[in-house]
Structure formats: structure tokens, C-alpha cells
From Swiss-Prot:
Main location (coarse class): membrane
Keywords of the record: Cell cycle, Cell division, Cell membrane, Membrane, Transmembrane, Transmembrane helix
Gene that specifies this protein: ftsX
Keyword DNA-binding: no
Protein name, entry field: Cell division protein FtsX
Family note: Belongs to the ABC-4 integral membrane protein family. FtsX subfamily.
The protein's role, per its UniProt record: Part of the ABC transporter FtsEX involved in cellular division.
Cytoplasmic domain ranges by topology: 1-21, 193-219, 289-297
Places the protein is found: Cell membrane
Length: 297
């Protein structure tokens, strides 16, 4: 097929169905943009989780007897527990925090509680850094019930709750994107049907003179995929605008405090090929199936 003929057929299709083409482009842009937003949230969560996992520690709280009478972990019970922790293969580092140090650390982090929190409220503890914070349950189980142990707290459980919110946001974005994608598919199918109907005479003549089905259907496929490509371009541009005007300002304080990973333009560029593949594949497959069902002769 000559490129000039193909280009002319595609442009003719756009001119005859301007409104529907624009609607399809915008719907594709919205669905792909939401899908891209979900992918960015997933990347943000994964990168931020890595930041927090590097800081995650398990805290082994000691009983009142040890906390009140041993400020430097010199008693037999405290030494035995520390040795048991240090000899574990899954432990990277251990440090002892006596009652006074625990109180000072808590007041430094939460000064508003200085007047209501007493020193006796904070037990002594071992702060334990694990080799793999993801595998903390074995350590927690081994420590609970040991002589001198009051309780075990692992920060990863708190982090999991935090990132459950981000997981929920990404799931919501994917769900809305799916609904929009269904709308885009229906628009593509409708556009292809209308385009084929408006050019039914030309198609009939070409088939009479021996043109193959592929020869007559290719312009419709290209038309749908080109419109989808435009939609993907708008979606990517929209993500960059949102990143520049909203995320950069709204999350700047979190970035500076290294509380979450930064969403950069490189992240958007990274997901762009996948968004393009999604948009083009969705439009091309929909157009092909529509033509197979609608244009039977």
C-alpha cells in the first residue's frame, strides 16, 4: 500500500469524524493518564518503602525489674539476653537504651508530652537492626517470652500500615483507569464503525477490483492507533504538568525531610513506553476486532 494513499485515507477519516476522534483522544488520554498515575504511585511506594526499610528497627522492651535496676546492662539477665540477640544470624546491630535514654529520646521526638510523661513510663530496651527487616517475624517470635522481655515492637508493621494508604490510592487510580479504558474502547469501536460506514462505497469499489481485506482495513487501524498515540501524548504531558505544578510544591517538605522518594521526570519517562504500548495496543486490537465483526464482506 502506498504511503500517500494511506495518509490520505487516515486524514479523510479524521475530517469526517472530528468530534468522535477528539472524544476518543481525550478519553484515551484520561484513561492512560490515570493508569500512568497509578504506576507512578506504585513506583513512589516502592522507592519510599526502600527508604524506610533501611531505617526499620525492632525494639525489645525489658521488664520493670531490669529497667529500674540496670542502667548499663550489667546484670546477668540483661547480659544473657543481649548475647542471645547478638549471636543470631539475622541480627545486624544491637544497642542498649536505658530508661533515662528512652525518656530523653521520646521527649526529643515529642516535646509536647514533656509535662505529662514520667520517666517511669519508658522501659529500657534493645534497639535491634535486622539484616532483612522483611523477615522480622522469626526474630519477634524468638524474643517474646524470653526472661526479662516485656514486649517486642517492630517498626515495619507501622510502615506497612502507612504504605497501605499508598497502595489504596494506586488501586483506586487503576480502577478509575479501567472504567475510562472501557469507555475509550467503546468510543474506538464506534468511531471505526462510523468511519467504515461513511466510506462503505469506496470500500465496496476497492473490494470489487480485487483489493484485499487488509488493504481496505489498514487505514482504519492506523486512524485508531494514531488517535490513541495523540491521547497518550496528552496523558504524558498532563503527568508532567501535574508533577511540576502540584507534586513539586505539595510534597517539597516531605522530599527535604527524606520522608518519601521523589517523583521525577525520569519516572514519567520510564513509564511512557508502557503507556504508549497500552494505548496503541488497546486501540489497534479494538479496531481490528470491530472491523472483523462489522465489515464482513
Amino acid at each position: 500500500m502506498r504511503f500517500g494513499f494511506l495518509l490520505n485515507e487516515v486524514l479523510t477519516g479524521f475530517r469526517r469524524n472530528v468530534t468522535m476522534t477528539i472524544a476518543m483522544i481525550l478519553t484515551t488520554a484520561i484513561s492512560v493518564g490515570l493508569f500512568g498515575g497509578g504506576m507512578l504511585v506504585v513506583r513512589l511506594a516502592d522507592s519510599s518503602r526502600a527508604i524506610y526499610l533501611d531505617r526499620v528497627e525492632s525494639q525489645v522492651f525489658l521488664t520493670e525489674d531490669v529497667s529500674a535496676n540496670d542502667s548499663s546492662c550489667d546484670t546477668t539477665a540483661c547480659k544473657a539476653l543481649r548475647e542471645k540477640i547478638e549471636t543470631r544470624s539475622d541480627v545486624k546491630a544491637v544497642r542498649f537504651l536505658n530508661r533515662q535514654q528512652a525518656y530523653d529520646d521520646a521527649i526529643r521526638k515529642f516535646p509536647q508530652f514533656k509535662d505529662v510523661a514520667g520517666k517511669d513510663s519508658f522501659p529500657a530496651s534493645f534497639i535491634v537492626k535486622l539484616e532483612n527487616p522483611e523477615q522480622h517475624k522469626d526474630f519477634d517470635t524468638a524474643m517474646k517470652g524470653q526472661p526479662g522481655v516485656l514486649d517486642v515492637l517492630n517498626q515495619k508493621e507501622l510502615i506497612d500500615r502507612l504504605f497501605a494508604v499508598l497502595d489504596g490510592l494506586s488501586s483506586a487510580a487503576f480502577a478509575v483507569a479501567l472504567v475510562q479504558a472501557i469507555g475509550a474502547i467503546l468510543l474506538i469501536a464506534n468511531m471505526v464503525q462510523v468511519a467504515a460506514y461513511t466510506r462503505r462505497t469506496e470500500i465496496g469499489i476497492m473490494r470489487l477490483v480485487g483489493a484485499s481485506r487488509w488493504y481496505t482495513q489498514l487505514p482504519f487501524l492506523v486512524e485508531a492507533m494514531l488517535a490513541a498515540t495523540m491521547g497518550v501524548g496528552i496523558a504524558v504531558a498532563g503527568l508532567m504538568v501535574v508533577r511540576a505544578l502540584f507534586l513539586e510544591n505539595a510534597l517539597n517538605q516531605f522530599y527535604q525531610a527524606n520522608l518519601i522518594a521523589k517523583v521525577d521526570y525520569a519516572d514519567i519517562l520510564f513509564i511512557t513506553p508502557w503507556l504508549l504500548l497500552l494505548g496503541v495496543a488497546m486501540s489497534g486490537l479494538t479496531a481490528y476486532l470491530t472491523l472483523r465483526l462489522y465489515v464482513r464482506r
